[in-house]
A protein has these predicted regions:
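Acidic (Asp/Glu-rich) sequence patches and key acidic residues
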Residues: 1-105, 109
């Protein structure tokens, strides 16, 4: 697995994918985490900037379901195999998020 759960964290810098709007709380049990190294290796920063025009590397970025679909399409078309695999894993989590919330938040490192 390319994404981590809270219990899998080993002290590296991570991006937290958190359900709903940013509320200032971190390290949630139902969040998923991507290490900074994996984020960079998969090239996610360039794909977020291409899809949204911005990405807050050190702060929160809220992503709506519509924006997520746009992002997935770009990665499916242009991303590496690693990027596509990572996005598929995030998407499994996002699907459960969007059943209850209209967005998720990526908390920067």
């Amino acid at each position: 697995m390319l994404v981590l759960k809270k219990q899998d964290l080993t002290g590296r810098d991570v991006f937290e994918f958190k359900k709903g709007r940013y509320d200032g709380l971190h390290w949630n049990e139902d969040s998923i985490y991507v290490t900074e190294e994996m984020f960079a290796e998969a090239g996610l920063l360039q794909w977020f900037i291409r899809a949204f025009g911005f990405f807050h590397y050190y702060g929160p970025t809220e992503v709506t379901e519509r924006e997520w679909k746009t992002f997935k399409s770009i990665v499916d078309e242009c991303g590496s195999d690693l990027a596509r695999q990572l996005v598929r894993e995030i998407d499994e989590w996002a699907a459960t998020c969007f059943k209850v919330h209209d967005r998720f938040t990526i908390c920067g490192i």
